Amino acid sequence: LLNYVAAAALMPYAPFLTAAQETGYDVDVLAARFGASWEQVAHRLTTLARPSARGVPFFMIRVDAAGNVSKRFASGAFPFARMGGTCPRWNLHEALARPGQTLTQVIELPGGARWFSIARAVRRFAVPWGEPEPMFAVGLGCELKHAGALVYGRGAKDMTPVG
């Protein structure tokens, strides 16, 4: 709850939703505009679910290099297992090998559901001197039908079966 309140203070709902829609949900632009990290913006995007002012219903997941899930949020459906790891064909895992790049992917699950995914490697803001600097991959996604609203999803077609 404390994290939600902090995010709401840093990225107030109405201005953030308007900016998200105007930028095509461009996470880097939103991070710069609101003075937040890529991960904070991705998390905030999952909270834009007010009945009178909804954003794209995103899910967000954060994994480490071993595939351990350390964060999982969704404003709508969440297409992946609640327990255990994630499919290695999902480019979420590739993001760790390509820091600084935002990767996109259209994925198709075994049941035929199609999703659009954005993945990026992120680091912690502050790490004590001498400590290892952990890197995580953050995945942000939505049902494929919403991909046209995203700057990343315009023209996305090629599918990768995952699951």
What are these regions (language model features)?
Residues L1-G163:
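Conserved binding/catalytic microenvironments
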